[in-house]
């Protein structure tokens, strides 16, 4: 997930999803539920459903303007490390990413990487995946896996997320993972990526488990972990 993509530089802004050697020549793309083989060259697509290359699928649940290239590229190791050779090398390269345009304001993107898939049929089936994106803003990003009952949340500042199944409030930026089993218990894991060495208060309400709001004070002041 990505959100809050901003720029005033007046030049095109992009997010690269992957760039790798074209180890497999076959690149398949699905757009408007029609699959096609991608030819050699540079291409732009408006909201394709998915792309498949070398056993790895890329699913785009929120659409977007994407660029894809499949071509021979030339360069030298010297361009990034002056102790290396200046000899030019050529390789076939696969590149995939999002175009945000010039001067984007609060642009977002979302994609799911699906390894171990080798056919268009399986990619079409994966579009019915249990992964739900419930929030993708510059203040919070929330994803849920419905089959596993796992919620993953990133709060970039104090905030509250709520829907019909749970409510979560935090008083500081943090990353959370919640597993809401149906046994009457929920597992909460929290991280402080900012390493602020402070206390973070989490308020959690899961009506299916309890009608009472649970408050947990997570103390990172000494160990940095909880």
Where on the chain are the PLM-derived regions?
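Terminal accessory/anchoring regions of large secretory-pathway or extracellular enzymes
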Residues: 1-226
């Amino acid at each position: 997930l990505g959100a809050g993509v901003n720029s005033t530089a007046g030049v095109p802004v992009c997010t690269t999803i992957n760039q790798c050697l074209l180890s497999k020549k076959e690149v398949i793309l699905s757009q408007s539920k029609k699959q096609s083989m991608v030819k050699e060259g540079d291409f732009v697509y408006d909201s394709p459903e998915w792309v498949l290359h070398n056993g790895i699928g890329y699913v785009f649940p929120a659409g977007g303007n994407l660029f894809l290239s499949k071509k021979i590229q030339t360069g030298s190791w010297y361009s990034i490390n002056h102790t290396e050779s200046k000899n030019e090398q050529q390789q076939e390269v696969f590149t995939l990413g999002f175009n945000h345009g010039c001067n984007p304001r609060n642009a977002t993107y979302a994609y799911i990487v699906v390894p171990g898939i080798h056919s268009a049929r399986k990619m079409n089936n994966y579009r019915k995946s249990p992964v739900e994106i419930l929030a993708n803003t510059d203040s919070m990003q929330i994803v849920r896996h419905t089959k596993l009952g796992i919620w993953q949340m990133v709060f970039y500042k104090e905030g509250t997320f709520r829907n019909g199944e749970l409510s979560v409030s935090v008083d500081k930026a943090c990353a959370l993972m919640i597993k809401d089993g149906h046994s009457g218990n929920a597992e909460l894991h929290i991280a402080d990526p900012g390493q602020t060495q402070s206390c973070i208060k989490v308020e959690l309400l899961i009506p299916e488990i309890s009608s009472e709001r649970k408050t947990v004070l997570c103390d990172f002041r000494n160990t940095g972990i909880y």
